[in-house]
Amino acid sequence: VDSLTDAGFAVNPTIQALYTSDDWAQYKRGSENLGSFGNNLLSINDAPWSAFDADARSSVSQYGDAAIMVIGRIGGEGTDLLGKSKDGIDNGDGIGPDYLQLNANETSILDGLKEMKASGEIKHIIVLINYAGMIEGDFLADPDIDAALWVGALGVGGEAIGHLLIGDVSPSGRLPDTMWVDNAKNPVLVNYGRNYYSNLDEFGITDPDGANESTFSTYTVYQEGMYLGYKYTETRYEDLVLGTANVGDYDYASVVARPFGFGLSYADFELSGMSVTREGDRDYVVNVTVTNTSDTYSGKCSVPVYVSKPYGDYARENQIQVPSVELVDFGKTKILAPGESETLTITVDEKLFASYD
């Protein structure tokens, strides 16, 4: 809230008072430990649309330039995502299949805001994704959502949000991971979960049903190799386009909501004059000129450098994994005013081109 007011936004005091009230203390994210390190049942626990009384809803139109919805999750070291949540994605009870989907309460808020937008009470709907990872992004296809900003885990960086939304600063980052339309289409889920050793009792490890389950009672076998995230989605799409054998059916648009490296800016940029030269024994030097072609906004531009390697006979015969595209480095301009240019020089070590057997 301070970020918004510091940037010049007028924040609805009625809604703010609800979220800070004792009655609404029940609505907060949390986790319930299930008896071992890293084994937590996570709770989304956002307030449903029905929790907003008539006074709260009527106050919205007085601040109707935009409704900002924050979608948050927790998780990290010691708090693995179990693929399900305490409150689930159904109607508030039971266990849902995916903690990273919107749950029923969040969907009800979004639907309520859409109704207010349709009636003219609010003009825009903005979604902020407050999570260090990626939630399931199918809902972003909704045309009633005017803007979305992945803000990660905020910390001291939260102060920038208001200035980004109001246009004092142009966004210049890019997504550090793939945002899936449906997490079930992510191949890592095939191996994800808690697999218990069948003979754990022989070694004095607590039984899975015991009260003090040991951290050492479970295991995971990783099978996906290099084909994680964008290295999977882009490689499979290339195989489809090239007619590679055994690729199967693959609809990129129904799998990827936003690709790795996706990012927008208020400014427009044009890249030109790219050259690649070899220097020394192992360096490749990429030069590219970036020009801000917009008339109004200044901003920085992130320029990723990818390598695409041929999948030759040797790799095929020896079953060497070669993704169709790999990020090897990136550069970023200074703040460019409209019409201003900068030439970036990005040096890439040849070792990053290697494939490992």
Q: Where are the model-predicted features located?
A:
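C-terminal non-catalytic regions of proteins with extracellular/luminal or membrane-system context
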Residues: 1-357
